[in-house]
Amino acid sequence: MFMREIELKGHIIDSFILAKVFDRTLELGGDYKVLEFDIGKKKIDTSYAKLLISGDTQQHLDQILEELQNVGANIPEIENANLKPALKDSVLPDGFYSTTNHPTHVKVNDEWIEVANPKMDAVIVVYPEEKRAETKVIRKVKKGDFVLIGHNGIRVMPPEKSREAGQLFEFMNSEVSSEKPKEAIIKRIAKEMHEIREEYKKTGTGGIAIVGGPAIIHTGGGPALAKMVELGYIQAILAGNALATHDIESALYGTSLGVNIKTAKPVTGGHKHHIYAINAINDAGNIKNAVESGVLKEGIMYQCIKNNIPYVLAGSIRDDGPIPDVITDSMVAQDKMRTTVMDKKMVIMLSTLLHSVATGNLMPSYIKTVCVDIQPSTVTKLMDRGTSQAIGVVTDVGVFLVLLLKELERLELQE
């Protein structure tokens, strides 16, 4: 039997870190013994636990320890991180450490270094002479890069549950359900957005990004989101060809997928409107030219151009067109999405499972994340794929956006 002590510190009960350590140890066929356990009595008090983890072999124990580090366990008397150079571009040394999306530090030459730009499913590349470390996706690893291997010298810090009563992310920290009070949730989201916008206006940092699908337009939520962009609540939009195309279709023809937005009735010949919209943008050259020439006079994309809000439109094999602004190289789109979202304070994901999962994979866990979808399974899938910090609002996205705008405008009047 091979054994190693681990430590857990912080709000390890409220944040379910202790429970996760117990569960993962047993799931992997290991065992544990609690050596010390000091529970904080007050809300501001942290807890501490020391556990003895055991495995059948050293390799088995190492596997368990790596999993436990990913949920926040620390190994006392940690050795320096083990580094090995990559022998080829995009080829990693055996035993490389695969990252989580949580803030991470590595111990190099007896000093702890914060790993820049945390994201899941990447590797840690260390620059010892510069006392610097960063995550890199496998395709960006170059020959000679020092890649972290094993589990020594790594400290992972998952986000803890908020201890402040009434905060959105404390209020929502429970199972995904369609039976939660929508009005109360929307008010708390609006309050959080208002605070983030005010901070952004003062500092120019942070802000809110939207990850949006075409259902925003189909359900009639487009004008509400466009107004939020105009009011300065949105600092970036990440979407695909469909959102932009149907937003432009709505602006030019008053339809989405050929259905009248106001009456919800199909329009004769409306099935061609989205192709007409693509053609109009192709003729203008791009969305910006369409706005400046007066072809496009309203909508989400119009407000992005008018208010200088960056957007990243990532292409898909399903796309019609696509419009000229769409990035058809998926790796280029991925890089631009990550750059755009990394510094944001909040990301709101609106009715687009695949784009939400893709964005969640690119960003650190400390970014506040809200996922809105009429299907509870969408939020569950997002969390199961690693974006565990996301809170879910199960509702129609069009209704959500209209009510959210109403609450934001109410907060505007109180200023």
UniProtKB/Swiss-Prot annotation:
The keyword Amino-acid biosynthesis does not apply. Keywords: Lyase, NAD, Nucleotide-binding. Its cofactor is NAD(+). Transmembrane segments: none annotated. NAD(+) binds at residues 241-242, 320, 352, 354-355, 373, 396-397. It comes from the Archaea. InterPro entries: ArgZ/ArgE-like (IPR005239), ArgZ/ArgE-like_C_1st (IPR048964), ArgZ/ArgE-like_C_2nd (IPR048963), LOR/SDH_bifunc_enz_cons_dom (IPR007545). It catalyses: L-ornithine = L-proline + NH4(+). It is an enzyme of class 4 (lyase). Its EC number is 4.3.1.12. NCBIfam families: TIGR00300 family protein. Catalyzes the conversion of ornithine to proline, with the release of ammonia. Belongs to the AgrE/ArgZ ornithine cyclodeaminase family. This is Ornithine cyclodeaminase. The lineage of its organism: Archaea, Methanobacteriati, Methanobacteriota, Methanomada group, Methanococci.
